[in-house]
Amino acid sequence: MSKPKVAFYWCASCGGCEETVVDLAEDILAVVEKVDIVLWPVALDFKYKDIEAMADQSIFATLLNGAIRSSEQESMARLLRRKSRHLIAYGSCACTGGIPGLANQFPREQILKFNYEDAPTVVNEHKTRPQLVFEEDGRHPHLPELHQVVRSLDQVVEVDYYIPGCPPTPKLTQAAVAALLDGRLPPKGSVLAPDIALCEE
């Protein structure tokens, strides 16, 4: 019997959620024995076209961390929603927008102007900014568009479960993955975490 397919993906985040998965240490080996990891850009080399070629709903579960800030992130969130039976908002940024959501206090233009022109550590005499499309040596690279606002994952696609934390602890992650694999899932929309604060443990 084939193992359930699992994907990990990150959007606008710091990388701490990915680090938690790595911090499972030897416990990750037990997870890897039970699943087939089909996407994990931080650790393994997979291409978007590989995911696009998969049948819809063929990924058992995707843990997606990070807020949605760019056109590429939104596109991947929509693709992974379509390909996954269970889409899990993993970490504070995916659940609520987290620290990246603080950017919503400022217009996009103000953020770009400060970062590329006005910050005290920036030297940019020509006021050059990244362009969505440009030509260089006969190539036409495309960059993702930065959206006007930062959104949580459930503001873009339907989310099945939430795993909170900044980042979620390895213990919480392991328990949530075990619940998924064992079929011990609460109703959709539930938070896969205890009802107590982390500091109470």
Residue ranges of model-derived segments:
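Iron-sulfur-associated redox domains of electron-transfer enzymes in respiratory
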Residues: 1-201
